[in-house]
Swiss-Prot record:
Protein name (Swiss-Prot/TrEMBL): Metallothionein-II, hippocampal
Entry's Gene Ontology BP terms: cellular response to cadmium ion; cellular response to copper ion; cellular response to zinc ion; detoxification of copper ion; intracellular zinc ion homeostasis; negative regulation of growth
Positions annotated to bind a divalent metal cation 4: C33, C34, C44, C48
Binding site for a divalent metal cation 3: C15, C19, C24, C29
Known function: Metallothioneins have a high content of cysteine residues that bind various heavy metals; these proteins are transcriptionally regulated by both heavy metals and glucocorticoids. This isoform may play a role in regulating the transport, accumulation, and compartmentation of zinc in the hippocampus.
Alphabetized UniProt keyword annotations: Acetylation, Metal-binding, Metal-thiolate cluster
Species of origin: Bos taurus
Pfam families with a match to the protein in the record: Metallothio (PF00131)
Length: 61
């Protein structure tokens, strides 16, 4: 559990624009909370599924 995120590892969460997640490990996370997505990723805000670094992110590949 990320102390700065209200979701468990592998779970799902919907972060507000002011999301403070620093190491979000959610299976699915909305908004720009996921560190795997580069800044400005339009698809990430629609519901990115993070699986690793930016080059492995399903929404930005």
């Amino acid at each position: 559990m990320d102390p700065n995120c209200s979701c468990a590892t592998g779970g799902s969460c919907t972060c507000a624009n002011s999301c403070t997640c620093k190491a979000c490990k959610c299976a699915s996370c909305k908004k720009s909370c996921c560190s795997c997505c580069p800044v400005g990723c339009a698809k990430c805000a629609q519901g990115c599924i993070c699986k690793g670094a930016s080059d492995k992110c399903s929404c930005c590949a």
